[in-house]
Amino acid sequence: MYKTESFKPDTFKPARFESDGKITLSGKEIPYHTICEDNVIYGPDGNPVASIFTYAYFRSDVEDTANRPVVFAYNGGPGSSCMYVHAGFLGTRRMQYDEVDRESAFGPYKVIDNPDCLIDIADIVLIDPVGTGYGVLIDESKKKDFFGIEQDAEALLTVLEAWVRRYNRGLSPKYLCGESYGCTRSAVAAGIAATMGRERGYGLSLIHI
């Protein structure tokens, strides 16, 4: 279920972290740049009401990214952070979970370069929705605006639109990758986008894992 830890609007400070790394895929070394940041959602009065946190991986040796695919991914629940698709599937580094003689399914795990990472062909954005992971509800009185099927999808679309504008990715093919309830989130978000006309009909493809 969602967590409801809150911050006073006048004390919330958006966070942003950047780093660089390299990964070898199919024998080729690929450099990437990572930006982890709050994506703040503001109310009509201009005060922050919530934040969706994103972990974005950009391949940094690509000169023209305007048409490069972007995969937006999240877990389900609802109420789960993106930790599982991040550390177990799509991140440049992941847990080593294929040890056949492992005594327990629980951690600690070794962390290795992810041989199945998609960074060679697409940029990757992992998402913590409001109330999960580092995604926070800032104004407790606005719960009803985020904790519901349509509300959750609407908040996701709001942040996706802002992210696409911020990084000039309007022409990029965009894929919504959801696990479990994340598939429902993707379908609802795509449905909202498809029925809102040209303002939001920017083209989404769905991936279910």
Which residues does each predicted region cover?
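Catalytic-loop region of hydrolases
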Residues: M1-V70, G88
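N-terminal cap/lid subdomain of alpha/beta-hydrolase-fold enzymes
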Residues: Y2-K3, P48-D145
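Active-site catalytic microenvironments for nucleophilic, acid-base chemistry
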Residues: S60, A162, I192-M196
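Alpha/beta-hydrolase active-site loop
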Residues: F146-V164
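Secondary-structure transition/capping motifs at alpha-helix termini
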Residues: R166-L171, A194-G203
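Alpha/beta-hydrolase fold nucleophile elbow
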Residues: R169-Y181
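Glycine-rich nucleophile elbow surrounding the catalytic serine of serine-hydrolase chemistry
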Residues: E179-G191
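Conserved small/polar residues in nucleotide/adenosyl-binding loops
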Residues: H208-I209
